[in-house]
Amino acid sequence: MPEITISMAAGRTQEQKIGMMRDITQALVKNLGVDADNVVIQINEAPLYHKMKGGKTFVERAAAAKK
């Protein structure tokens, strides 16, 4: 039973997350030959101020991109 955990910054819509999980499920069915009922996917979301890349929080990066 494949179990996939996705860690990502918060901010995507419920529809986007569900679509992503469905696509991943289908990719596992196609490429691993597993039954979709055996695929488990979990999303762990973090607030943008709890994630950092290149020494800047995602909030800081978003603000800089708007300038």
Feature annotation, model-predicted:
Residues 2-67:
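A domain-level signal for the structural core that forms small-molecule/cofactor-binding pockets
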